[in-house]
């Protein structure tokens, strides 16, 4: 979205989904004010009555946003902002809008209240089916470093959810899907393939160990689980598929 700067501030909007109640009204939007904090190499965001400070190269915490398809109806979501750069021009990335797990507009868990319970227990967390924004990296909207930071923010949330669930499961089955190794192999397997066409003009050596490091993170989770279970508990670590070089596709 192109924005115009007025001295040290920008007044714009954060756009959400299409208005689900009134056809032809376009996308829902909520006001967003951006203030430049030059001495801190940062910006301040003011949105939905709250302020957030972000430094260059950092993500914001989860930001609660409210959209109004009608004056008396509110649709609540959450998102994170990432400050790519301040100069020579502002570049600010925002994740896709996720359903707010504390006040979900649609069922995102079963039972319905479980999503709310988790948010109260560990704080806000990603609710989008594929939370890691792979297309933002594919299309150059964010770089590899920003994608890695995002992936591990979501990884930390998933780990918290799993370990809390494990603590509260004295018997029966406790299962959790960790997406991080999958997402990172999709995006960084090229670094293990010297002939991959996506490597042209892009950094390779710096990210050659990304996949190995993701499995080290998962090994750490396995260690935490082993420390929490007894000899009568069966632990299964299962992969649903593997990876191989993928150089060409048809749109």
Regions found by a protein language model. Give the residues of each.
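His/Asp/Glu-rich, glycine-adjacent segments
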Residues: 1-201
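Conserved acidic
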Residues: 147-150, 154, 206-210, 214, ...
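Extended hydrophobic/aromatic segments used for targeting, binding, or gating
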Residues: 187-228
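Metal-dependent active-site segment of extracytoplasmic phospho-/sulfohydrolases and closely related
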Residues: 213-251
């Amino acid at each position: 979205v192109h924005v115009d700067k007025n001295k040290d501030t920008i007044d714009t909007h954060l756009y959400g989904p299409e208005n689900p109640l009134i056809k032809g009204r376009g996308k829902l939007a909520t006001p967003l004010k951006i203030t430049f904090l030059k001495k801190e190499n940062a910006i301040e965001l003011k949105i939905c009555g709250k302020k957030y400070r972000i430094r260059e190269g950092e993500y914001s915490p989860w930001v609660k946003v409210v959209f109004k398809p009608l004056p008396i109806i509110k649709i609540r979501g959450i998102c994170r902002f990432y400050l790519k750069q301040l100069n020579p021009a502002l570049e600010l990335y925002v994740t896709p809008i996720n359903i707010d797990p504390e006040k979900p507009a649609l069922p995102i868990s079963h039972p319905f209240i479980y999503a709310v319970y988790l948010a109260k227990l560990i704080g806000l967390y990603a609710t989008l089916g594929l939370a890691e924004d792979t297309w933002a990296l594919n299309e150059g909207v964010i770089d590899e470093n920003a994608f890695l930071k995002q992936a591990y923010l979501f990884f930390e949330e998933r780990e918290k959810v799993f370990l809390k669930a494990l603590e509260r499961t004295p018997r029966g089955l406790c299962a959790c899907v960790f997406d991080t190794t999958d997402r990172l192999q999709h995006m960084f397997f090229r670094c293990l393939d010297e002939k991959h066409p996506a490597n042209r003009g892009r950094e390779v050596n710096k990210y050659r160990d990304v996949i190995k490091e993701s499995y080290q993170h998962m090994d750490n989770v396995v260690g935490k689980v082993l420390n929490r279970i007894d000899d009568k508990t069966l632990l299964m670590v299962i992969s649903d598929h593997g990876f191989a070089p993928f150089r060409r596709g048809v749109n």
